[in-house]
Amino acid sequence: MERDTVKFKVYCVEEYRRVHGLTAPQTVDLFERYGVFGFLDEPALRWQSLDNTVIDIDEYIEARV
């Protein structure tokens, strides 16, 4: 995995957990359960704000529940 991709995914985990009041392990479990890490490989997500990325992650998870 490319270093920039890893850094982006870490930023997303941290922002998502902060917004939703989760721990890092809870967030990683959630992301793994719903395939969010694969979704975060989408290059277009890196060009928007983290706030918008969190919204996109929420929508991605909701579509899979």
What feature does the model see in each segment?
Residues 1-65:
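C-terminal alpha-helical interaction appendages
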